[in-house]
């Protein structure tokens, strides 16, 4: 009996690319997704055979693609970043936008909450990283000097409380590590041969993984600022995430979702979507467009590491679960 991931169901409500997925830390039956359809959807997870979740609320207000969404640790608020240049804080119970964060001069590509939810960080095509409080006040802007020289595509807080850290990825081909206390540069991690789309920090804060255009994932020791090793994903990488329960790294590439066991550095899963099988399952056959090419653009694990949520270019969220087969 092998352990692997099987497609559990789909979640359909977005009409364009699913750009981000946020999962609650208490493993409750909800997730939040963001999309190029300019909306954020709060889902209730029914975990039924075909339809894994149903839309509970659609949050609207952004005037352009919503590129990223994250949840506060109590699950009460969602934070989004959009190509309209703004961040928004959403009250999920009310379904309303509680705050707008205005200051970036170009598209916001990435947002994150600090561990205590008191600080917010954002990354933009204006090449800056901004640090905000929850009132929507910009407290610091990382720009010029040591800052990135091209679009900042992704920004994440390290979960390590000993050394509060921000990690950013950029189209300038670098990953940068910043001290949160003074917003000063600690390390520039160079090694990619193309733009970097995404960066992920391991659950214990010791490692970070980066990926993008060159199709190679680089693993870094965050404390030392040193490159540890690389994993060849074979095509453009759009998202990365570490499993919260296994020593696994998951990558959304333009070919498939690949999962590595970091101990053996071998691929344990290579998840592809069969659109014909899916069409037969959801509509009982019919005119599925088999020529359509879709790929995964966003990924996140459930807090217990049992379920992998993946968002695709066709607007569908697909749910994979660990099972035996």
Curated annotation (Swiss-Prot):
Top-level taxonomic group: Eukaryota
Keyword DNA damage in the entry? The reply is: no
Q: Where are the WD repeats?
A: 13-44, 61-91, 103-133, 147-179, 191-221, 232-261, 291-321
Short name of one Pfam family for this protein? WD40
- GO annotation, biological process: negative regulation of translational frameshifting; rescue of stalled ribosome
Please verify whether the record's keywords include Metal-binding.
no
UniProtKB keywords: Repeat, Ribonucleoprotein, Ribosomal protein, WD repeat
TM ranges are none
PROSITE patterns reported for this sequence: WD_REPEATS_1, WD_REPEATS_2, WD_REPEATS_REGION
Q: Name one GO cellular component term.
A: cytosol
Q: Which GO terms describe its molecular function?
A: protein kinase C binding; ribosome binding; translation regulator activity
Q: State the coiled-coil residue ranges.
A: none
As for family, the record states:
Belongs to the WD repeat G protein beta family. Ribosomal protein RACK1 subfamily.
Q: What is this protein called?
A: Small ribosomal subunit protein RACK1
Q: What is the lineage of its organism?
A: Eukaryota, Viridiplantae, Streptophyta, Embryophyta, Tracheophyta
């Amino acid at each position: 009996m092998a352990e692997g991931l099987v497609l559990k169901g789909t979640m359909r409500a977005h009409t364009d690319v699913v750009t981000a997925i946020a999962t609650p830390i208490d493993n409750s039956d909800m997730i939040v997704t963001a999309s190029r359809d300019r909306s954020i959807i709060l889902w209730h997870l029914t975990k039924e055979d075909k339809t894994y979740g149903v839309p509970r609320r659609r949050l609207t207000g952004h005037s352009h693609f919503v590129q990223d969404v994250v949840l506060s640790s109590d699950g009460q608020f969602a934070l989004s970043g959009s190509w309209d240049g703004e961040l928004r804080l959403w009250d999920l119970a009310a379904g309303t936008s509680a705050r707008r964060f205005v200051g970036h001069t170009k598209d916001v590509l990435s947002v994150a909450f600090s561990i205590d939810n008191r600080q917010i960080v954002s990354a933009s095509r204006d090449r800056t990283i901004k640090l905000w409080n929850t009132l929507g006040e910009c407290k610091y802007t990382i720009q010029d000097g040591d800052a990135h020289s091209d679009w900042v595509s992704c920004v994440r807080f390290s979960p390590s409380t000993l050394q509060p850290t921000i990690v950013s990825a950029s189209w300038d081909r670098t990953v940068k590590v910043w001290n949160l206390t003074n917003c000063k540069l600690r390390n520039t991690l160079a090694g990619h041969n193309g733009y970097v789309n995404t960066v992920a920090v391991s659950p214990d804060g010791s490692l970070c993984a980066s990926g993008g255009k060159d199709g190679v994932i680089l693993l870094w020791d965050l404390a030392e600022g040193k490159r540890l090793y690389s994993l060849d994903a074979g095509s453009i990488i759009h998202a990365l995430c570490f499993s919260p329960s296994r020593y696994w790294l998951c990558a959304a590439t333009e070919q498939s979702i690949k999962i590595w066991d970091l101990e053996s550095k071998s691929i344990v899963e290579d998840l592809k979507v069969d659109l014909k099988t899916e069409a037969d399952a959801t509509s009982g056959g019919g005119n599925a467009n088999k020529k359509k090419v879709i790929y995964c653009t966003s990924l996140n694990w459930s807090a217990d590491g049992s379920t992998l949520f993946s968002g695709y270019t066709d607007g569908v969220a697909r749910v994979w679960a660990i099972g035996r087969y």
